[in-house]
Each structure stands twice: as structure tokens, then as C-alpha cells.
């Protein structure tokens, strides 16, 4: 259910794009992200920092798209967000010796310390690559194809990556 809730702004963006076009869809994405944060704050009293980052990025890049009437900015938004995730993962590990993946998932699964480190780096690299793929699609395909990729392609890549990670991690997980 959380996965679908996380996709809420993307799904609304997709639907709005198909009905009204990129500029209305961009405005819808900004509002949907605000609503998502308001709901999380109301329900849990705490909003994940990455949701705030997402709101900032969609507001800045979406706002630039609307003000300048240029869809290039909204096409850069996923890449900037993916790269922000990557930087957060890698810098937190290298500069602060804090593994964010372990901090998020450490209570759910038990893994050797070295595997947590590898997992953190692999996720960081994945987000860099996903950002590059987004730019490739944004600059080499139509806006309609990019929107389809944003919902189905990027989400599909994420699901496949998570399944692959689960299979890889299963051999390291301790029996409880």
C-alpha cells in the first residue's frame, strides 16, 4: 500500500498529462506532492526528509517548467531527484560513516556489515544510472514517450532492481 501511496503524484501526473498535457500535469504533480506531504504529516506527525527533497525538486523544476513554458525542466526533475538520493547514500557513508540503507532497513533484516556497505553503494550507483537513463529518454524520445517511461519504465526498473536485490540478499540473511 505504501508503494502505491508513494506513486500517487506520479500516477496523477500521468493521468493529467494524458488528458490535459504536460503543463497541467506539472501543476498537478506539484499539488499532489503537497497533498501527499500534508497527509503523511497528518497521519504520522513526521515526514521523511526525502519527501521534502522531492517536494523541493518538483516545485523548483515544475515551477520553472510552468513559468518558462518549457518542459525540459520537468524532464530533469526525476534525474535530479535520483542523483540527490545517490549523493545522500554515498556521502553519508563516506563522509559520516552512516549507512542510510541500513538505517532504513536494519530493523527488518539482519545482514553482515560488509553487505550493508555494498548494498548502499549499489543503490547509489543504481540511482545514478536511472538518472542517466531518464535523461537519455527525455532527450531522444517524445514527451509522451518520456511520460510513459517515467511511470512504467522507471518504476519497472525499480521493481526489477528490488527483486534482484532481494535475491542477492537472501543468501546473506540470517535465519531467525
UniProtKB/Swiss-Prot annotation:
* UniProt keywords, alphabetically: Cell inner membrane, Cell membrane, Membrane, Transmembrane, Transmembrane helix
Say yes or no: keyword Transmembrane helix present: yes
Q: Where in the cell is it found?
A: Cell inner membrane
Give the disulfide map: none
What are the GO cellular component annotations?
plasma membrane
- Secretion signal: which residues? none
Note the topology in the membrane.
Multi-pass membrane protein
Alphabetized InterPro entries for the sequence: YciB
Q: Where are the transmembrane segments?
A: 24-44, 49-69, 76-96, 119-139, 149-169
By sequence similarity, the record places it as follows: Belongs to the YciB family.
What NCBIfam families does the database record attribute to this sequence? ispZ, PRK00259.1-3
> PANTHER family attached here?
INNER MEMBRANE-SPANNING PROTEIN YCIB (PTHR36917:SF1), INTRACELLULAR SEPTATION PROTEIN A-RELATED (PTHR36917)
- Functional description taken from the UniProt entry: Plays a role in cell envelope biogenesis, maintenance of cell envelope integrity and membrane homeostasis.
- Protein name listed in UniProt: Inner membrane-spanning protein YciB
Question: From which source organism is this entry?
Answer: Paraburkholderia xenovorans (strain LB400)
Amino acid at each position: 500500500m505504501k508503494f502505491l501511496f508513494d506513486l500517487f503524484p506520479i500516477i496523477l501526473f500521468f493521468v493529467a498529462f494524458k488528458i490535459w498535457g504536460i503543463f497541467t500535469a506539472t501543476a498537478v504533480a506539484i499539488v499532489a506532492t503537497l497533498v501527499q506531504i500534508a497527509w503523511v504529516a497528518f497521519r504520522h506527525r513526521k515526514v521523511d526528509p526525502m519527501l521534502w527533497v522531492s517536494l523541493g525538486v518538483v516545485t523548483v523544476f515544475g515551477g520553472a517548467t510552468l513559468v518558462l513554458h518549457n518542459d525540459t525542466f520537468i524532464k530533469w526533475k526525476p534525474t535530479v531527484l535520483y542523483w540527490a538520493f545517490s549523493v545522500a547514500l554515498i556521502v553519508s557513508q563516506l563522509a559520516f560513516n552512516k549507512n542510510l540503507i541500513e538505517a532504513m532497513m536494519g530493523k527488518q533484516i539482519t545482514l553482515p556489515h560488509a553487505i550493508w556497505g555494498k548494498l548502499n553503494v549499489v543503490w547509489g550507483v543504481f540511482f545514478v544510472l536511472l538518472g542517466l537513463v531518464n535523461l537519455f529518454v527525455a532527450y531522444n524520445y517524445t514527451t509522451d514517450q518520456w511520460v510513459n517511461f517515467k511511470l512504467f519504465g522507471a518504476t519497472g526498473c525499480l521493481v526489477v532492481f528490488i527483486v534482484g536485490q532481494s535475491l542477492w540478499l537472501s543468501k546473506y540473511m540470517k535465519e531467525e
